[in-house]
């Protein structure tokens, strides 16, 4: 296993809640979604995201929501995560319209698609994540009286363990087509863990199943991000989070793996290409961010 140059905050048996370690990244992304929702020309609406920030009482994120930035630099990460959210929203909407009635959100974090999207009747949305994250989300949404638009099933499990067993025990049927999202997760897994994740998903997918994978940063470089934040001061919206210390630099190529295992892979797109597809012109700061973070958004169908 290769660890980041700047030292890792990770260990093989580390654990987290919503305000620590990898769990905090889910809270941070929820903050960016909340900012995008209320910002200029939002691509998605996530009215629940702000409630997670309030419930967390995180002073940094509460400060961002209280005084949102409006410049192109200041809205960069909310904009880019809005693009990412729209990509996965569109993926599930297309799968749902095609008749797939099982959706699996891997490392669901504070994702609220079970509540936001207009699912067809009979659809079940399975959310896999560690217990403390799922418990926090359920508590906040319950306090807000949120009602899912599909049959939502929480699956408390660590992806480094035998998560397929609790998933199938929760009602997932591997004999029926399913749609899977792996959003923003891969940089936080070792190459071996990525390979194991792909293999387990593959084993659970009937013909016609679909998968979407993607992250804004398939490669995270601490020095380049710091240099960008110096040149574009408004970009620094991650507080003191050092993503390089939470991620791994050994990878399994997802496209290569999927093709070798019989999946039909659509053309890979970057966040910049997605923006153009959504009718936007990527600002210079977005181009610079993607030049070193190297976003990848992938969809594929099981033959």
Curated annotation (Swiss-Prot):
Gene Ontology MF terms in the entry: methyltransferase activity
Ligand binding (S-adenosyl-L-methionine): 129, 158-159
Enzyme Commission number, as recorded: 2.1.1.-
GO biological process terms held by the UniProt record: methylation
Group of enzyme by EC: transferase
Protein role: Exhibits S-adenosyl-L-methionine-dependent methyltransferase activity.
PANTHER family cross-referenced by the UniProt entry: S-ADENOSYL-L-METHIONINE-DEPENDENT METHYLTRANSFERASE YKTD-RELATED, S-ADENOSYL-L-METHIONINE-DEPENDENT METHYLTRANSFERASES SUPERFAMILY PROTEIN
Protein's recorded name: Putative S-adenosyl-L-methionine-dependent methyltransferase MRA_1908
Organism: Mycobacterium tuberculosis (strain ATCC 25177 / H37Ra)
């Amino acid at each position: 296993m290769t660890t980041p140059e700047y030292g890792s905050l990770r260990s093989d048996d580390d654990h987290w809640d919503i305000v620590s370690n990898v769990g905090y990244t889910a809270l941070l992304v929820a903050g960016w979604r909340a900012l995008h929702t209320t910002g200029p020309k939002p691509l998605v609406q996530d009215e629940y995201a702000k409630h997670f920030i309030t419930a967390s009482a995180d002073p940094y994120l509460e400060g961002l929501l209280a005084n949102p930035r409006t410049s192109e630099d200041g809205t960069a990460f909310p904009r880019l995560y809005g693009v990412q959210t729209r990509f996965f929203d569109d993926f599930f909407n297309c799968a749902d319209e095609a008749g797939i009635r099982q959706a699996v959100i891997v490392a669901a974090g504070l994702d609220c698609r079970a509540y936001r999207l207009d699912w067809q009747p009979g659809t079940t949305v399975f959310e896999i994540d560690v217990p403390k994250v799922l418990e926090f989300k359920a508590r906040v949404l319950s306090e807000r009286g949120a009602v899912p638009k599909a049959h939502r099933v929480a699956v408390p499990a660590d992806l480094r363990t035998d998560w397929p067993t609790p998933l199938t025990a929760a009602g997932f049927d591997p004999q029926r087509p399913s749609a899977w999202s792996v959003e923003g997760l891969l940089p936080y897994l070792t190459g071996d863990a990525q390979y194991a994740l792909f293999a387990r998903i593959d084993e659970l997918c009937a013909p016609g199943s679909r998968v979407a994978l993607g992250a804004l940063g398939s490669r995270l470089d601490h020095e380049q991000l710091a240099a960008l934040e110096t040149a574009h001061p408004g970009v620094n919206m991650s507080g003191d989070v050092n993503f390089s210390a939470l991620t791994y630099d050994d990878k399994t190529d997802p496209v290569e793996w999927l093709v070798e295992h019989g999946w039909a892979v659509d053309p890979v797109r970057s966040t910049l290409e997605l923006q153009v597809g959504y009718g936007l012109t990527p600002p210079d700061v977005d181009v610079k961010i993607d030049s070193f973070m190297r976003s990848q958004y992938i969809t594929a169908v099981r033959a």
